[in-house]
Structures are given as C-alpha cells and as structure tokens.
C-alpha cells in the first residue's frame, strides 16, 4: 500500500488535511502513552531506526524550544542528525537557499527542519528540490518542515497546540471558543490558526490586541472564509467587560523590538493591554486554561509567573507535547508509519484555473460592429485597439495612475494614441478609464491573460477597417504567474527582489477577489502585484 505521508513537506498547516491531522493526533496519543509507560514495543513501531537516514536542522534564526524539541524528537528515531552552523555557512558568502539545500540533499539527507526570517522559503525549497531530486535520481525526495518563517506561519507549533486543545477537550472536535491575546501582528503561531482551527466543526475566535499589534487582515479574511466567528477587542480589560468569555486563552509575546520608535514610546501602555493581572482572575469562567508558545519575557511576561501553580496553567504540558507531536510527524514523513491511514486523498494545493475569466463577446455585424465614440473627446479609430471601462467607479487620480501601470505592463508605451478619463454613458457620476491605440495590434491568449490580470473588468475592442473585429471582457484570473514583472510587496517574502533568490512571484485569488502571494500569503489588490516591466 502506498504511504501517503512519505516525502511530504509541511510548509503551512494546510499542507495536512483535517483527516491527516486527526491521524497524527491519534498516533501522538498512542506514542505519548507508550513513552510514559516505557512501552518499548509500541515505541519501536514509530522509530525510523536507520543510521543512514539524514535529518538536518537548519535554524537561521535563534530558537531554543523548537530546535531542541526537534533535536530530541530526531534522537528518539536513532537516525543521522546534522545541524547547519548558520554563522559559518555559505549563506554568508551569498549562496542561494536553493543551492545550499540542494547540496545538502545530495548528501543523502531526507528531512530538513528550517527556521528563517525569510517568509515562504520552505514552499520554494519544496518546489526546487522536486526538480533537483528528479534530475539527480536521488534515493528520496527531500522534505521540508517549516519551523517558523518570519511572521508568516509556524505549522508544527500549530499541531502541538491543536493536540493540547483536543486533549483538554476530551478528544472532541465539535467546537472551540478561543481568545488570541498579545502580538497578533508578528506572532506566526496565531497566524497558523487561521487554517489550523478548521479541525473543529464550530470555531469562535476572539482577537485581543491594540491596533498596533492587531491581526493582519489576510488572516482575519482567512478565518472568515473558513466560517469562523471573529470578534475583536483592544485589551483584556475590554474583553472581560462582556459576558461571552472563552475558556481557552492563547497568549503571545509582544515583539515590540520589531516595530518603530512611535510604538516603542507606547510600549508600557501596549503591554498593559495584553498582560493578565490578578484582578482579572475572578472574572474568568470556571475551567479556563491559558496557553503560550513560549518563551515568556522574563521582565514583562503576558502570563505572569504567579499563575504557574494555578489550574490556569496549560502551557507547560503544551510545551512537553511538542516533542511527542514532532516525533510522530518525523515518523510519518519518513514513511515509518502511515500505511494504515484510510482517509481521503489530500486536495491539490493548486487552485482551480478552468474558469472563463476571458469572455469573448459576440459581435452583431449589422449594428455592434460599427465603431462609435467611446467617450467624449475620443474619436473612433479605423484600426487599432480600445481598452474601455478601466477601473470603473474609482477616482480619476486612481484611474490615471493605474492606466500608466497597464500601459507599462502591456507594453503600450510606443506609438500613437492616448488615455482618457471619462464618465459612464449610463451613469454620469461614475468615472472610467479608456486607452486607445491606432495601428496594427494582435492579442495572443497570453496577452489576454495579462490584460485580465492587470485590468480586470475592462473591455478590449480590436478594430479593423472601422469595425469592431472582436471584443473581450476580462475578469480576475484564479492564479497569476509566469510574468516577470509580478512582485509581492512583502520584502521578507522569498519571491521579493530584496531576497535576490530569483523566485518568480505567484498569486492566487482569494474569496474576496484579491490576490494572496503563494509563498508568504500577503494580500494584494490586482493593482498592487505589478512592478516595472523588465526590458
């Protein structure tokens, strides 16, 4: 039977389906019990037990718990464990991520555990390593585990969090009401919950953070897409003034050092808003538990140490569970366990593309084909193109700015013609943009895709001998890729030019008709994903 987990990467929490995570948690429950009871027979069911099986820790950012948790998990498996010394590695000589990891994969290393400030790096390495594996006929396809990438995600922390929540919920997946408290902007552990909490049938999330530390919009949108009920509060004090208080509280450390001087001036006020105080205890419902990915700040802990010996303490067992979860994850990816998984096939991470986002409009030769004036001041042309209805409904300044972007992206800088901002013939108060170019123009399917990506909801008219030869209406494509001038606006993203990795930007459409970067998840409008066209 084919093992569905062997060689799989975990770059974001959604790389494992809900059924696959339930399988992992069931196995973790079994292994944890075996270790506590020193049941060697059950432990051996999980052990990789192969001295030639290479697991490599590559931590390019400081870590204690995650690194040591993985190290101890790997030692349990009795494998070849290596650790890249980042300070003396070829990264400091300007070597790319792809070259470094391909080299290490060539030395018969099978699983890479990676922590980096660069967001989306594991997703890129997964794609790159697949090609390297095939070119060089390696014994195993390298797998990558994201141990935290910038402020993006921390999927193994999400796994151990979920396991602990479920363990404390009598192994029920029915519902969860959770309060996320602290630095929700930088805290990648809370970002993973936007998809991770889908494992519960009913999810209610209370976001508790001042505006400066609030959850990024992308993750709030993801929660809403996933059917979560989401509420927002600016402080613990405000949250406890209302009656519907969660039993599960998840705190994160404020990372104020990553923010500017204006925020640092308010640090005492910001910390106070997300730090639990003694007077709050009497306002908590019975059976409330607190969790924290750790570490706690020794001077300014959001969960003060006076709570350590109280029933609120769920964070210590949560930390211990991390090693058990990671033991099982390594066992699954190595193919030691997983043959007995009977869940459905995982859905492809590729987005659906077989939809009509370029629609050819039928031309009525007796009437519609005659070129009429598109707008006041724009005379009909005999041959050429007219792109109409650009940014309909926007302000004239916005329309003009985006028309210049369309001209650059579509390569329409040369030749005669012009641009015009006008009002709609049907709605005089609604502005739209028009680009017209007389001359001989041909539009390939690739050109139409490009136009759809940069000028959604416009109309393209191809004109010959004074008649409309063909007409197309554009809509937002489900994915945008294979264009050199695409750019993710997040400088920490592996695909951003600032990283000098040569990774092509790829975007997929969200449910609210915007675009998310495939690597880091940053949300863009279709107007924001284009850089300057490369010559």
Curated annotation (Swiss-Prot):
Zinc found in the keyword field: yes
Binding site for Zn(2+): 488, 493, 517, 520
Family matches, as Gene3D superfamilies: Aspartate carbamoyltransferase regulatory subunit, N-terminal domain, Aspartate/ornithine carbamoyltransferase
Annotated EC: 2.1.3.2
Chain residue ranges for the region called Aspartate carbamoyltransferase regulatory region: 371-535
Pathway(s) where this gene product acts: Pyrimidine metabolism; UMP biosynthesis via de novo pathway; (S)-dihydroorotate from bicarbonate: step 2/3
Reaction catalysis annotation: carbamoyl phosphate + L-aspartate = N-carbamoyl-L-aspartate + phosphate + H(+)
Entry keyword annotation includes Zinc: yes
UniProt xrefs under Pfam families: OTCace, OTCace_N, PyrI, PyrI_C
Cellular compartments per GO CC: aspartate carbamoyltransferase complex
InterPro entries (UniProt xref): Asp/Orn_carbamoyltranf_P-bd (IPR006132), Asp/Orn_carbamoylTrfase (IPR006130), Asp/Orn_carbamoylTrfase_sf (IPR036901), Asp_carbamoyltransf (IPR002082), Asp_carbamoyltransf_Asp/Orn-bd (IPR006131), Asp_carbamoyltransf_reg_N (IPR020545), Asp_carbamoylTrfase_reg (IPR002801), Asp_carbamoyltrfase_reg_C (IPR020542)
GO biological process, one term: 'de novo' UMP biosynthetic process
Entry similarity comment: In the N-terminal section; belongs to the aspartate/ornithine carbamoyltransferase superfamily. ATCase family. In the C-terminal section; belongs to the PyrI family.
Protein name as annotated: Protein PyrBI
Primary gene name: pyrBI
